[in-house]
Amino acid sequence: MISKAIIKKVSIAPRKARLVVDLIRGKEIKVAKAILMFTPKSASSIVLKLLNSAEANLAQNINLKSNDFYISEVYVNEGIRLKRLFPRAKGSGDMIKKRTSHIVLKLSMAKEIKEEIKAKKKEVNIHGTKI
C-alpha cells in the first residue's frame, strides 16, 4: 500500500456502496475511473471522489505517475445508524434505521514497477554510492 483515502459517515447504506466498490477492486486507476463515471448508482460519485483523493495523496507523497498504480484494497464498513420514528396507526410508530458507511480505498504499485524500483535500490548501497 502506498496511498490511502478514507471517507466516514457517508449517508448511503453499506449494502448499496458495496455493489459499486466490487466493480473496481483490483483495477487500474484509469479503468476504475471510467467504470465509476458510467455506473448509474448514487455511490459511484462518492467512490469516484474518494479515488481522486487517493490519487492526489499519491501525487503529493511521491513523484510517480498514477497510471502505474492499481486499487489493491477497497472495502465498505458499516457506520453509525441514525434511528428515526415513522408514525403508524393508533399512536404507534416504526423504527427507520438510516444507515451510514465508512469507505476505505488503498492504492498500490503494479508488480513490474515494484521490481524495477527494487533493482534500482540494489544498485545503490547505504551511503548512496554505486556498488
Curated annotation (Swiss-Prot):
Record keywords: Ribonucleoprotein, Ribosomal protein, RNA-binding, rRNA-binding
InterPro entries annotated for this entry? Answer: Ribosomal_uL22, Ribosomal_uL22_bac/chlpt-type, Ribosomal_uL22_bac/org-type, Ribosomal_uL22_CS, Ribosomal_uL22_sf
Q: Which domain of life is it from?
A: Bacteria
What are the annotated GO cellular component locations?
cytosolic large ribosomal subunit
Q: Name one GO molecular function term.
A: structural constituent of ribosome
Q: Name one GO biological process term.
A: translation
Matching entries from PROSITE patterns are given as: RIBOSOMAL_L22
UniProt entry tagged with the keyword Ribosomal protein: yes
Name the family: Belongs to the universal ribosomal protein uL22 family.
Q: How does it assemble?
A: Part of the 50S ribosomal subunit.
**Physiological role:** This protein binds specifically to 23S rRNA; its binding is stimulated by other ribosomal proteins, e.g. L4, L17, and L20. It is important during the early stages of 50S assembly. It makes multiple contacts with different domains of the 23S rRNA in the assembled 50S subunit and ribosome. The globular domain of the protein is located near the polypeptide exit tunnel on the outside of the subunit, while an extended beta-hairpin is found that lines the wall of the exit tunnel in the center of the 70S ribosome.
Query: Entry's HAMAP family?
Result: Ribosomal_uL22_B (MF_01331_B)
**Database matches in PANTHER family:** CHLOROPLAST 50S RIBOSOMAL PROTEIN L22-RELATED, LARGE RIBOSOMAL SUBUNIT PROTEIN UL22M
Protein's recorded name: Large ribosomal subunit protein uL22
Q: Which organism is it from?
A: Phytoplasma mali (strain AT)
The gene that this protein is the product of is rplV
